[in-house]
From Swiss-Prot:
InterPro entries: L-rhamnose_isomerase, Rhamnose_isomerase, Xyl_isomerase-like_sf. Binds 1 Mn(2+) ion per subunit. The keyword Hydrolase does not apply. One of its GO terms (cellular component) is cytoplasm. Belongs to the rhamnose isomerase family. The gene is rhaA. NCBIfam families: PRK01076.1, rhaA. GO terms for molecular function: L-rhamnose isomerase activity; manganese ion binding. This is L-rhamnose isomerase. It is an enzyme of class 5 (isomerase). GO terms for biological process: L-lyxose metabolic process; rhamnose catabolic process. Mn(2+) binds at residues 262, 294, 296. Pfam families: RhaA.
Length: 418
């Protein structure tokens, strides 16, 4: 460490020790908490299936910042820079549309070999991989239905796509030695008020059971399901509602995915974590930033991001919660978006680990809510930034906003040529 950072580090450790926090233990724990970065920030959820395809499914990437990745080589290059600017363990989250093939491949025919380059790259960079079937931006999803489709042939196509995706996910886990979390999200819903809300959910229930019927090694693959309140073009009815997937995950013992933008604007997923964990074995979190709707803005170090991290740490959910990011902003430098959002998630985890939780919990149990509030607020002023800077330097990444210099240089030399 540089002298100034080392001095600040030593003083900060003393301050935290005075309130009963072991900084070294906190950092050891932080190094066991990977954040899964989402590949789709790098190309606005375009994928490699059809570079000229239109994004559908009630989601939208807004903006036209230059330098968007156009192929796997460019995307991996962009990711490598982002990874080099973020301290601590990371993973990469892939969608099925990021396959690599010299010839077109039907989505229900995708195989592990179509992702072999991703696996080789992940091994090189010591990353785990997570996966998602892509049930959108496809002719057979154009009417707004996939796994709940009334046409059995179309429904079967999407069942087969999800089944193929599970095998790819298991391949990731087997090859990389860390389980791949595969999340199923579908856009199925209606723009206006439906007459029959039940039948699509019955079809979805049956389809999901068929999707997960093949037994896969849990050391390689973990199933997750994700709800949503609404999407563009599906404002009045979403088949995969929160109640549907909460019931499904609890009854089938899959992981439940909570996306920060998939609920009513007055709801927060930090308040849902402790309840859901009573009924499901695992949670997958999609940390995002909804602005008035599921806008998927870049994650900030705001109150909700901090609350999400605090829930994980306070309840020792390290082995049951998988932390992923889900945002896509095309109005700013896409590499910077990754770096900002992921560093903020890690800052939130660090701050949560530096909280004197046991002391605060004892005050709460004694009913001393005055002291609880006072200490909770005072600990916000403790010098966590000095610990963060030391952690960054230990991991050979820029300590402060100097990481932006590397992004600007790359933008000038590489992105501007695209």
């Amino acid at each position: 460490m540089t002298n100034s950072i080392e001095q600040a580090w030593d003083l900060a450790k003393q301050r935290f020790a005075a309130v009963g926090v072991d900084v070294d233990a906190a950092l050891t724990r932080l190094d066991t908490l990977p954040v899964s970065m989402h590949c789709w920030q790098g190309d606005d959820v375009t994928g490699f299936e059809d570079p000229d395809g239109v994004l559908t499914g009630g989601i939208q990437a807004t903006g036209n910042y230059p330098g968007k990745a156009r192929n796997a080589t460019e995307l991996r290059s962009d990711l490598e820079l982002a990874l080099a600017l973020i301290p601590g363990p990371k993973r990469l989250n892939l969608h099925a549309i990021y396959l690599e093939s010299d010839t077109p491949v039907a989505r229900n025919k995708i195989e592990p070999r179509h992702f072999s380059h991703w696996v080789a790259w992940a091994k090189k960079h010591q990353l785990g991989l997570d996966f998602n079937p892509s049930c959108f931006s496809h002719p057979l999803s154009a009417d707004g239905f996939t796994l709940s489709h009334a046409d059995p042939e179309i429904r079967q196509f999407w069942i087969e796509h999800c089944q193929a995706s599970r095998r790819i996910s298991a391949y990731f886990g087997e090859q990389l030695g860390t389980p791949s979390v595969m999340n199923i999200w579908i856009p199925d819903g209606m723009k206006d008020t439906p007459i029959d809300r039940l039948a699509p959910r019955q079809r979805l229930l049956s389809a999901l059971d068929e999707v997960i019927s093949e037994k896969l090694n849990p050391a390689h693959h973990i199933d997750a399901v994700e709800s949503k309140l609404f999407g563009i073009g599906a404002e009045s009815y979403t088949v995969g509602s929160n109640e549907f997937y909460m019931g499904y995950a609890a009854s089938r013992q899959t992981a439940l995915c909570l996306d920060a933008g998939h609920f009513h604007p007055t709801e927060v997923i930090s308040d849902k974590i402790s309840s859901a964990m009573l009924y499901v074995p695992r949670l997958l979190l999609h940390v995002s930033r909804p602005v008035r709707w599921d806008s998927d803005h870049v994650v900030l170090l705001d109150d909700e991001t901090q609350a999400i991290a605090s829930e994980i740490i306070r309840h020792n959910l390290f082995d049951r919660v998988h932390i992923g990011l889900d945002f896509f902003d095309a109005s700013i430098n896409r590499i910077a978006a990754w770096v900002i959002g992921t560093r903020n998630m890690k800052k939130a985890l660090l701050r949560a680990l530096l909280e004197p939780t046991d002391r605060l919990r004892q005050l709460e149990l004694r009913g001393d809510y005055t002291a609880r509030l006072a200490l909770l607020e005072e600990q916000k002023s403790l010098p966590w930034q000095a610990i963060w800077e030391g952690y960054c330097q230990r991991n050979d990444v820029p300590v402060d906003a100097r990481w932006l210099d590397a992004v600007r240089e790359y933008e000038q030399q590489i992105l501007s040529q695209r």
